[in-house]
């Protein structure tokens, strides 16, 4: 399936969700097509991530003679075509990993040529693991090693958290954001639903890591705890009672239990009659 390889686990599940980032897939066209338009993660900026996918479109000659020049050319072309976008993730695929293309070196060269852009590389070809799970791990660990704490953002609340492992499937991240706003909690970074590249560079500034999908994103939460002392709290937002339990756990951490109970009461009053109909 489109989720069946390690590359897909990195690009389709996590990286490709970001709303302001060019997703450059260094490999044959099929690798890009297979991980495009197969997930429903909308954004509040016109669904940029769902409209576009980029590929170096490797052919046989590039496999034989190397694809680094083609990658460099493709990166410049993408930035030229999307002048408002200054962030990019570059992924290796099976062919480009097998021939040993050095995508990190190419990324450094492009960033030197274009000082206003930032590029993250994910070296996770399909064959590097037995399932998509390997791709989750590679992107999680690569991001915290290379990008976290490379930027600071303004903190506007006394309560801050990272919301990790939620990918805005059918807009759930945006719905949950309304709850955090009502509770007065600032989300430093969404990993990665409706999220931005630069917000993810600020994950070290949060007081709490709330994990919604542990399988895909628990790795970075564990590393944030180990390196920065940020506690990890797991919730399940899929389900009425589960969500209420999650809100209670988060509010207990911040000492705002009354706010949490008020929010839950409002939502119960709104939705319980409709839920009762199904009983």
Swiss-Prot record:
Which molecular function terms from Gene Ontology are attached? ATP binding; iron-sulfur cluster binding; metal ion binding; nitrogenase activity
Q: How is the cofactor bound?
A: Binds 1 [8Fe-7S] cluster per heterodimer. Binds 1 [7Fe-V-9S-C-homocitryl] cluster per subunit.
Record keywords: ATP-binding included?
yes
Q: Which reaction is the catalytic activity of this chain?
A: N2 + 8 reduced [2Fe-2S]-[ferredoxin] + 16 ATP + 16 H2O = H2 + 8 oxidized [2Fe-2S]-[ferredoxin] + 2 NH4(+) + 16 ADP + 16 phosphate + 6 H(+)
Q: Where does [8Fe-7S] cluster bind?
A: 5, 31, 94
Q: Name one Pfam family in it.
A: Oxidored_nitro
Q: What's a BP term from Gene Ontology annotated to this protein?
A: nitrogen fixation
Known function: This vanadium-iron protein is part of the nitrogenase complex that catalyzes the key enzymatic reactions in nitrogen fixation.
Belongs to which family? Answer: Belongs to the NifD/NifK/NifE/NifN family.
List the protein's name: Nitrogenase vanadium-iron protein alpha chain
- Species: Azotobacter salinestris
């Amino acid at each position: 399936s489109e989720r069946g390889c390690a590359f897909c686990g990195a690009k389709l599940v996590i990286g490709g969700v970001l709303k302001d980032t060019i997703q450059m897939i260094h490999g044959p066209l099929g690798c890009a097509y297979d991980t495009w338009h197969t997930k429903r993660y909308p954004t509040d900026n016109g669904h940029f991530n769902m409209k576009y996918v980029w590929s170096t479109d490797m052919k046989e000659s590039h496999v034989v003679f190397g694809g680094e020049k083609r990658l460099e050319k493709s990166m410049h072309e993408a930035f030229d075509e999307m002048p408002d976008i200054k962030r990019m993730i570059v992924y290796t695929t099976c062919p480009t990993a097998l021939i040993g293309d050095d995508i990190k070196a190419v990324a450094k060269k492009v960033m030197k040529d274009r000082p206003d852009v930032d590029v993250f590389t994910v070296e996770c070809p399909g064959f590097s693991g037995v399932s998509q799970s390997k791709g989750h791990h590679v992107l999680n660990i690569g991001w915290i090693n290379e990008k976290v704490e490379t930027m600071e953002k303004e903190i506007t609340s006394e309560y801050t958290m990272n919301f990790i492992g939620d990918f805005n499937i059918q807009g759930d991240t945006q719905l949950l954001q309304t709850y955090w706003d009502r509770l007065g909690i600032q989300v430093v970074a969404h990993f990665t639903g409706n999220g931005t590249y630069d917000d993810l560079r600020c994950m070290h500034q949060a007081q709490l890591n709330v994990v919604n999908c542990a399988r895909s994103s628990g790795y970075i939460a564990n590393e944030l705890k180990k390196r920065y002392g940020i506690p990890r709290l797991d919730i399940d937002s899929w389900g009425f009672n589960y969500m209420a339990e999650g809100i209670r756990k988060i509010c207990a951490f911040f000492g705002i239990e009354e706010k949490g109970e008020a929010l839950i009461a409002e939502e119960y009053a709104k939705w319980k009659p409709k839920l009762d109909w199904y009983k």
